Amino acid sequence: MQFHERFDVIVVGGGHAGTEAALAAARMGCKTLLLTHNVDTLGQMSCNPAIGGIGKGHLVKEIDALGGAMAIATDFSGIQFRTLNSSKGPAVRATRAQADRALYKAKILNILQHQPNLRIFQQAVDDLVVENGRVIGAVTQMGLAFEAPAVVLTAGTFLGGKIHIGLENYSGGRAGDQPAIALAHRLRDLPLRVGRLKTGTPPRIDARTIDFSVMTEQKGDTPLPVMSFIGDLSQHPEQISCYITHTNEQTHDIIRGGLDRSPMYSGVIEGIGPRYCPSIEDKIHRFADKNSHQIFIEPEGLTTTEIYPNGISTSLPFDVQIQLVRSIRGMEQAEIVRPGYAIEYDYFDPRDLKNSLETKVIDGLFFAGQINGTTGYEEAGAQGLLAGLNAALQVQGKEAWAPRRDQAYLGVLVDDLSTLGTKEPYRMFTSRAEYRLLLREDNADLRLTEKGRELGLVDDFRWQKFSEKRESIELEQQRLRGQWVHVNSPQVAELNEVLSAPLTREASLEDLLRRPEIEYDTLMKVDGFGPGLADPLAAEQVQIQVKYAGYIQRQQDEIAKAERNENTRLPLDLDYSEVPGLSNEVTAKLNAHKPETIGQASRISGVTPAAVSILLVHLKKRGLLRKSA
């Protein structure tokens, strides 16, 4: 049966990738359909109730700078906010928020339901319609066919999902949800490389059975940060504490005693789990010399008694889970509300994707989220936004867009995936970026909002706030450069009290701010120098740009040097065995990866600078030298 309307973009799946994809396509004016197996689980936080963190917070800010929903929903649902690495430089500072699951999901649903051009329909998708190498629609489990020239697939852990608790297992997309078995079989018929990955979640504990008095209280930051560039402290709900406790030798003995019934250590699970979010079984095995591991006791919300014990993700049998939980200080009487489990699922090799997240073999078909081998809400949301905007661009007959590695962590993410692929769940860290000083949380809007406006992603309200902020920064920088202090100025005595060395020659306010011992706020308190900027985010931007100007310029020079051949296009149909001079190893790797640009080719392991030179000569001889936009 054919649905009576035709759409521009269909998004399959309503998790963090799917919601951002659907919102992006709709914001760009495309008639968009979001297909979900259950409207009540749109935007659901399936694992930990938190958004942000090192590397991840940077992605959230970038989603926000491009008009996405994740940061806004976090401000409305965050019950504890912290700035991680606050004592370190601005490049690695990151915002993290503990979120109320119910409030977060409710805000996402509210945003979806009020988005023009977006239709939501509840039905699981069983099939894709592909004709002549191009996707033209999707078919639901009741045989209802929807037509669209672009489809974004964001199936999360649902493709062939199998849940494991001890040696027992059953099919499931996550606890309480059916898997997408028919769709998984359909995708395996396509000429795409497929693998299996695994992730897991800890048991949920009833807070009424926990003794918090013997744990270490962890409060949020004061003053509170906000997640969105258009966020406001008044949006935050009540703020509460988290707590910290630890495993012990008894805990570890219990876990070791249960490993013979662990699906991971008995060969039942074949999928590879996340390296940077290991199960407690993995921790005990890999770090056998440690007699204790930290556990963060995180509330799941303001109106629930469920607690998320971050750090004891497990798929051990339920009886072992009870023992290990009750061996932990403060949880001796704990009751488990939901058992922990592991889930195995299909993912598709992201090397089969373009940087736009469109598949290289099926035109109009885009993948985003865990289907690409990533882990985390933030990584999924960022990919969803990129896939959604590129699906819209394709429908509109426009050229695809993806940020470069020097423009955004999103650029690092998609370049890593499409160039190198992954054999384990991929998590974003600041260490993955070469140009961290340029890719800070605080300047995500300055890096991306103008591009978002050009693409049609950024609404008038956000654009006005951004424009006002950008203008105020520029005007303040001009003022600091133009206002001078002479040695005999009346402010010098006051200044010398905070300077490490007395002022001996005239200096501009910018020169003074460049000194490591001077903060912007301190400078503005000197008589005649203020009042300065009222917006603390704009003031922070002025300070960072002045103090790090030399380092920033150095990184920009490095980028300009690297860009000479970075964006030189490589034909996707190029047979590298026909390029004379390449070694067999390089030929095999290039034919397997099919890089889109010289820059991507150069980052493939084993592709030498000499091989890159050979490629450039070959392209020049064939008249194929051209740059991407």
Curated annotation (Swiss-Prot):
- CC terms in the record's Gene Ontology section: cytosol
> A single GO BP annotation from the record?
tRNA methylation
Identify which cofactors the protein needs according to its UniProt entry.
FAD
UniProt entry tagged with the keyword Electron transport: no
Localisation:
Cytoplasm
Protein residues bound to FAD: G13, G14, G15, H16, A17, G18
One Pfam family, short name: SAM_GIDA_C
> What GO MF terms are annotated?
flavin adenine dinucleotide binding
Q: Which InterPro entries match?
A: FAD/NAD-bd_sf, GIDA_C_N, MnmG, MnmG-rel, MnmG-rel_CS, MnmG_C, MnmG_C_subdom, MnmG_C_subdom_sf
The family database entries (Gene3D superfamilies) matched by this protein are listed as: FAD/NAD(P)-binding domain, GidA associated domain, C-terminal subdomain, tRNA uridine 5-carboxymethylaminomethyl modification enzyme MnmG/GidA
Keywords in UniProt for this one? Cytoplasm, FAD, Flavoprotein, NAD, tRNA processing
Q: Which SMART domains match?
A: GIDA_assoc_3 (SM01228)
Q: What residues bind NAD(+), as annotated?
A: 273-287
Family, similarity comment: Belongs to the MnmG family.
| HAMAP family reported in the protein's UniProt record | MnmG_GidA (MF_00129)
Which PANTHER family has this protein been placed in? GLUCOSE INHIBITED DIVISION PROTEIN A (PTHR11806), PROTEIN MTO1 HOMOLOG, MITOCHONDRIAL (PTHR11806:SF0)
This molecule's function is given as: NAD-binding protein involved in the addition of a carboxymethylaminomethyl (cmnm) group at the wobble position (U34) of certain tRNAs, forming tRNA-cmnm(5)s(2)U34.
Subunit structure as annotated in this protein's UniProt entry: Homodimer. Heterotetramer of two MnmE and two MnmG subunits.
Q: What is this protein called?
A: tRNA uridine 5-carboxymethylaminomethyl modification enzyme MnmG
Q: Which organism is it from?
A: Shewanella amazonensis (strain ATCC BAA-1098 / SB2B)
Underlying gene = mnmG
